[in-house]
From Swiss-Prot:
Protein name as annotated: MICOS complex subunit MIC12
Deletion consequences: Increases frequency of mitochondrial genome loss. Partially altered shape of the mitochondrial network with condensed, fragmented mitochondria accumulating at the periphery of cells. 20-40% of mitochondria exhibit an increased inner membrane surface and stacks of lamellar cristae disconnected from the inner boundary membrane.
Quaternary structure, from the entry: Component of the mitochondrial contact site and cristae organizing system (MICOS) complex, composed of at least MIC10, MIC12, MIC19, MIC26, MIC27 and MIC60. This complex was also known under the names MINOS or MitOS complex. Interacts with OM45 and POR1.
Taxonomy, superkingdom: Eukaryota
A single Gene Ontology CC term: mitochondrial inner membrane
Transmembrane listed as a keyword: yes
Function: Component of the MICOS complex, a large protein complex of the mitochondrial inner membrane that plays crucial roles in the maintenance of crista junctions, inner membrane architecture, and formation of contact sites to the outer membrane.
Encoding gene per record: MIC12
Protein's GO biological process: cristae formation; protein-containing complex assembly
Keywords, alphabetical: Membrane, Mitochondrion, Mitochondrion inner membrane, Transmembrane, Transmembrane helix
UniProt KW Transferase keyword: no
Residues exposed to the Mitochondrial intermembrane side: 28-106
Protein localization: Mitochondrion inner membrane
Record organism: Saccharomyces cerevisiae (strain ATCC 204508 / S288c) (Baker's yeast)
Lineage: Eukaryota, Fungi, Dikarya, Ascomycota, Saccharomycotina
Transmembrane parts of this sequence: 11-27
Length: 106
């Protein structure tokens, strides 16, 4: 049995408690408050899906070239610029075809 001074014993005790506390924190609480067990994995997934449905979170990988389009009822939809250009193109084609077919109706 070695004789440690009171300062060395308190430093040893403090370091031991600190290491044990840090390991416990990293194991249990470091994942945004979710525990590392099976139920918490499903709870985290449920919260992520709810945030996507409520449009509080964006689908990963789908954030480039986005613009905001607001519909009449106040719902905001996020779309790519390519989708918007395709919609404008399709609307112009439909209007042109309707105009051409209107010649035959007269």
């Amino acid at each position: 049995m070695s004789k440690l001074g009171p300062l060395a014993r308190s430093v040893k005790w403090t370091l031991s408690v600190g290491v044990i506390g840090s390991v416990f924190y990293l194991y249990r609480y470091s994942n945004n408050g979710y525990f590392y067990d099976h139920d918490a994995t499903w709870l985290k997934q449920d919260h992520q899906v709810q945030d996507l449905v409520d449009r509080k979170e964006v689908v990963p990988g789908e954030t480039r070239n986005r613009k905001l389009v607001v519909t009449d009822d106040g719902t905001a939809w996020s779309r790519t610029m390519g989708e918007s250009i395709k919609d404008i193109w399709n609307e112009q084609i439909r209007n042109s075809v309707d105009w051409i077919y209107s010649w035959g109706k007269n």
